[in-house]
Amino acid sequence: MKLSFTKMQGCANDYIYLDCRASGVPADIAALAQRLSARHFSVGADGIICICAPVTPGADGRMRIFNADGSEAQMCGNGVRCVAEWLYTHGVEKPVLTIDTNSGAKRITRQGAQLWQVEMSAYSTLPADLPAIHMGEGPLVDQPLTVEGKVWKVTCISVGNPHCVTVVEDVDSLKLEAIGPAFEHHANFPERINTEFVQVVDAAHLKMRVWERGSGETWACGTGTCATVAALTELGICPAGQDIHVQLRGGELVIRVLPGRQLLMTGSAVTVYEGVAEV
């Protein structure tokens, strides 16, 4: 069977996009995500994103995300910008789009060619919202976490999906392939966790790497970048109400923390190519 797809990327966080608005999500989507995401052997991607019919009145579409290991994710900040770009270039030419996700409807505003701003949900630092266990019931800000025999200071943030943020001196020297899985599968996070390692350049500029649950190290993570800026705002390192520039392996995202812990994320959404895969 032949499967038409669009390859898109936001800060090199690349996914295979399927138009499922009429057909629905393929029944074998988990296996399909594993097979097509395999780099060097297939299309290669961080996963598959299905563009579906909306479920909320007035919404323009729905996004469902399947990681490279076949698991379904709640939200992807880079992915939702690409869904907006895909809809915009496929007949939904509106400056503001609303897209349903597994963590609620997101409002996305076009800022220019291949540039979109996402109004993210309010973040939380409470363990019940991650979830996290064995870490108390209060805000998880600047808390000790023992991973592979080393004590790390972490701040845990939910932005619709769970993140663990830790500040390091030199992000480039980290061996994420060794430490990332230990964070992801830590016993304190029963549903696994995404982990961000961040180096502070100054109060408005950060450098970050991310280990995503279900995908491993990726070149960017929109929700992870939001969680990182939220965490550093909680720590008093970054100011609220100002644009914070975060450099990832795949490019730059700009995040702003608004009153009420709301977040704005601005970044690119680029179509790489369209293709057909034999499945």
Role assignments for model-derived ranges:
Residues 124-153:
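Active-site glycine-rich loop that binds ribose-phosphate moieties when present
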Residues 73, 121, 128-132, 167:
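Flexible, glycine/proline-enriched loop segments at strand-loop-helix junctions
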Residues 1-113, 165-279:
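A glycine-rich beta-to-alpha transition motif near the start of alpha/beta enzyme domains, typified by
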Residues 116-120:
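Intrinsically disordered, low-complexity regions enriched in acidic/Ser/Thr/Pro/Gln residues
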